Amino acid sequence: MPRDTPQTVPGHSPFWPLFFFTHNNKREARHDLARLSLTLMPILPRLFHRTSRTSSADTQRDARTPPNASPLHGEPGRTPRSRGELGRNLRLRSNAQTSGTPGTPARPQIRASASRTAPSTPQHPQGTEGTRTVPNSPLHNDARVFRERADHTGLSAWRTEMLTRFIEHSRKHGLANDFEQVRVYDRLSRAVDHLKSVLRMSGDSVQLKSLPVPELPDVTFEIAHLKNLETVDCDLHALPATLENLFLLETLSLKGAKNFKALPDAVWRLPALQELKLSETGLKSLPPVGGGSALQRLTIEDSPLEQLPAGFADLDQLASLSLSNTKLEKLSSGIGQLPALKSLSLQDNPKLERLPKSLGQVEELTLIGGRIHALPSASGMSSLQKLTVDNSSLAKLPADFGALGNLAHVSLSNTKLRDLPASIGNLFTLKTLSLQDNPKLGSLPASFGQLSGLQELTLNGNRIHELPSMGGASSLQTLTVDDTALAGLPADFGALRNLAHLSLSNTQLRELPANTGNLHALKTLSLQGNQQLATLPSSLGYLSGLEELTLKNSSVSELPPMGPGSALKTLTVENSPLTSIPADIGIQCERLTQLSLSNTQLRALPSSIGKLSNLKGLTLKNNARLELLSESGVRKLESVRKIDLSGCVRLTGLPSSIGKLPKLRTLDLSGCTGLSMASLPRSLVLPRDGLNVIFPEHLKTDVGNARIQQNPRARLLEGHLERQNEAMNHAMFGDDESVGSMTSVPDNEAGVVSMAFHAKHAYKRLERLRQEAGSSMAAPMRNNDAESMRRALAYAFRSMSDLPTFKKLDNAARSLSYEVQEQLADLVAAPVGQKLVKAIAEGAYGAGRDARAIEQMLPELATRIANHPEIQQLREQAKRYPSSLPPEKLAAKLTPLIQPLWDGTRAVAPMPGQLRQALQDLLVTAEGRQLASEIDRAAHSHRAGDEGKALRGLLPVLAAKIGSDPRVVRVREFVSRHTFGSPQQRAESLAQTLTPVVQELWAQTQAEVAKQGQTPAASPSRQR
């Protein structure tokens, strides 16, 4: 290779994407190339010609590649044949880009690549000639490789200038950072692309974000169709007068431009401008307003604006004005002369203390924060419909406040108001009134009850101790009086016939008026934190529309009887001395879905509770006197999903049916110290699937032990570990004790170490099973047994005389999943089948190697058994002619068919998925299964050491070799095309043919690992 040829990664061409086609057909490849020719034309000469064989001392720019040079020797070769019209076009285009003279073969000038640095990065600012960099990059100004199209927009120059300024500024202030320069260059490039797309009529909006640019490119103000211009966190200093060229601009938004000090006069001459947003800028003033402006929305936020511009009253189309966190000291009286102004928002303007006398046509006024302490008279804001004054110094409302005939919504929160004017009763259009957190407000005027249109009233956090007569507020639907000194309700309170939601919490109420029962529209009643409230009126139980009743932290000891047809859905009584609930609650409150009676003095629940057929949640926590639940009351709760009995320390027993409730998902018994194991129903100790039982701490160990004894997988694992311990003792000490037939005795020290290693992990798994058994969601598998396996075990029990042997078989069979039980049930009738069932169970759930991997493969094993044609034939025969194929005979015939499937599954289980798939065809024959087992032992055995670890790393490579080997591909294609013999015969032929091939590839893999292990650094003998 010539010395000036660029280095490339082996196996990769530097221009590989240009030669990658998805079709093999040459005609389609030429079509692909033709479609790319227009965009790739400038660099095609570099693809068809190589650099010259000149030495490094030669002048590179004078180097030439001889015409028709051989790509290997640089010698003249054969004349390339014509490629048709495309070839002629390529040659013409190539000749046009070269510097050849007439009479001399024109070839493109090729520059040797002196560097392969990352293109266009600040870390490589010194671009040498020939470096592959991005053309015209501001970080590589001297680097040129490809001819670039002329930029008539000036955007590239603007990008270069802005980046240069940024770099100079960073260096000047000691903030130079290459990575930040890269990010800025990337953002500038994306901004340039965005502007170009808008220039191409791809949109009518420009959004620029986080750019350190003091000015926008001139071309921005030449986009005649631009409608929206927005900058966010751009370091703009000014906008040019050419802004007025954007005669279609509708929205102008500048946010985060701290150095933006002046707005050009042209902004008022934009005929289509409707919205102007100036947030977080440095503006202290605005230019004088000219006539003809179409501005409708003006927002100035977080800016040091000191005054509104002259001629502000000329904005005759301005409808919304928002001034937040500015330095305004006063508002121009011209605001009242704005005929279209509907919304005025003044938030957090610390120097603004008063409003102009007239607000004109303003319909919505928002005053949040600030020092405004008074409002204009009603005549100055006669159009007002919505008033919001929050966190303000407002101390008084105007006396004629009631003259605001259009006012519908008022919020006066956290102010210094002491009282309300009497004229407030004249606000007949008022719908919502919120008076929250006004600590100096102690009373309401008598006229307050005349607000006939009022629908929602909120009086929270005030000093109000009584309400005026409310008879006139007939439209009131929501009343909230929380955290007040309210001591009583008016006598005519029951006249609020439309009241639907009432909250009286944390007050000084002692009782509710008897006419509360007349509130027939009432749906929710909240009485929380009323410590002095001891009784409820009996009429309360006859509120047929009441859906939610909440009593918390009160002194109520008894609930009133419920009337027939009650609509109550939620009843909550907490932290109260309640001693009983109505005996007929289950009859009268059939719609009840949530019943919470916590921290009360209840001793028992009425039996009628069992008739609450819609009840979904029952909470009885921290009832220290609750001793029992009635069986008749619990067993009929068919819809209940959660029962909370936590903290019921005197509870000594539970209904036996509680764990059998069909929809129960959670039962909380934590803190029930009076319960014992004897008092727990079996349906809780061994819960059904999906039932979460939270036991008290003192019972968790006993419950776990009881569950572990009923868990077939745990018993299987314990038995397997016991036999392994016997086998290890026999191997180490030569005991004469008999060793279980399912456990082989290790014949050397390595075998004992391996068995001990796997036993250690099995003990950890057993400990996890014990912990899970004591947890709330532990559920034994006794209800997951297949019906066919139950029948098979019953048949085996009658024929087996040895009970311990049957117990082992029972544990093994029932530890399997449902689908595996279905496929193995036929094997239990014969001893040879029983042995296979126990082997499969111990392989998946025992203490052996790869148990977890084998467990995950069991569903696939079940599928293969179900789809095996000979097994299907035998089962069909036994079903049709049971006398000709009894269970013992069927089991004896099925076992040798299922045994190979199990052996193959056990061999490939720990292997990667690709290798498992590659070896599936081999598992039909004994030789193939033996080879798979050999690969498994060599790669995954505990005693394999470093060699096994290396082999495991190469297993995916082995799978790829098997899948791509030409012999394997040909054999599989041949078998798929021909239908000789039966499917079983074809599978056996395929396995017999592929086994030697895979054996050869496996031997090569082993040899490669062995070769790697013979290096001097890895050989202790050589080190010595």
Curated annotation (Swiss-Prot):
Residue ranges, compositional bias (Basic and acidic residues): 75-88
Subcellular location per the Swiss-Prot or TrEMBL entry: Secreted
Principal subcellular localization: secreted
Gene3D superfamilies xref list: Ribonuclease Inhibitor
Pfam families reported in the protein's UniProt record: LRR_1 (PF00560), LRR_8 (PF13855)
Positions annotated as LRR repeat: 192-218, 223-246, 248-270, 271-293, 295-315, 316-338, 340-359, 360-381, 382-403, 404-427, 429-450, 451-475, 477-495, 496-519, 521-543, 544-566, 568-589, 590-612, 614-636, 637-661, 662-687, 824-847
TM spans (from-to): none
Entry keyword set: Leucine-rich repeat, Plasmid, Repeat, Secreted
Bias kind Polar residues: ranges: 92-102, 112-139
InterPro entries, per the entry: Leu-rich_rpt (IPR001611), Leu-rich_rpt_typical-subtyp (IPR003591), LRR_dom_sf (IPR032675), LRR_domain-containing (IPR050216)
GO annotations of cellular component type: cytoplasm; extracellular region
Highest taxon of the lineage: Bacteria
Chain spans, region Disordered: 50-139
Known function: Probably involved in host-pathogen interactions. May interact with plant target proteins; may modulate a plant signal transduction pathway.
Official protein name in the record: Protein PopC
Gene (UniProt): popC
